[in-house]
Amino acid sequence: ISIISKAQTLILSENDSTVMTEYNDGNLWAYRNANGFIVGLTTYETKDDYGKYYRIDVFIKNQCDSSVIFTPDDVTSHLLTNRGDNYQLMVYTNEAFQKKIRKSQNWAMALYGFSSGLSAGSAGYSTSYSTSYSSNGTAYTTVTNHYDANAAFQANMASSYQLQTLGKMMDNDREIKRQGYLKKTTVHPNEGIIGYMNIKRKKGKILTINIPINGYVYSFDWDVSK
């Protein structure tokens, strides 16, 4: 799977004392330290075989004395468009993103099966041509189709094997995609979690990401106009 990434620029107000920034592996991270939690985030554009997204890598550290449940379903995002409108973007939960992947993979398998079926369907058939001449010299060509049942059986077996192989590859692909994608998690005191989510991409100026934790919303604004 090919992935293309494009980094973004964080927008900060001068009097915001809750934010610290640093570069990690070439990406700009912003951390908000407030209400007993440190929430870090970086975002960038990505493009893979399944579409174009804003990807957010999220870090959450619980500095409270009690456990808190982090629910990715509560993460929201909106975009200030070039026309000045606020547009609500879809933040994919793990379940929604896996469903999108499965749908794309089912289409790929269906198209692959169709093309394999065409090849298998024509297997076993061969064509021969014979030419004869009448008494006045006119040529007549006879076309004869031959069918080899064993060749057709072998081709269908090969087609089925190709589909099974592709299906197994996609199962492994899904397992890889699920690693690190944020899910509902209990964050215990002094524990931290890190993962990522994808947001449906749309062109605009400012991307705002809101991460609610324990009744407080941690917001981050990113310049995505470039």
Protein language model regions, located:
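Sec/Tat signal peptide C-region and signal peptidase I cleavage site
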Residues: 3-7
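Hydrophobic, Leu/Ile/Phe/Ala-enriched alpha-helical segments that form helix-helix packing faces
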Residues: 1-2, 64
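Conserved functional micro-motifs across diverse proteins
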Residues: 8-226
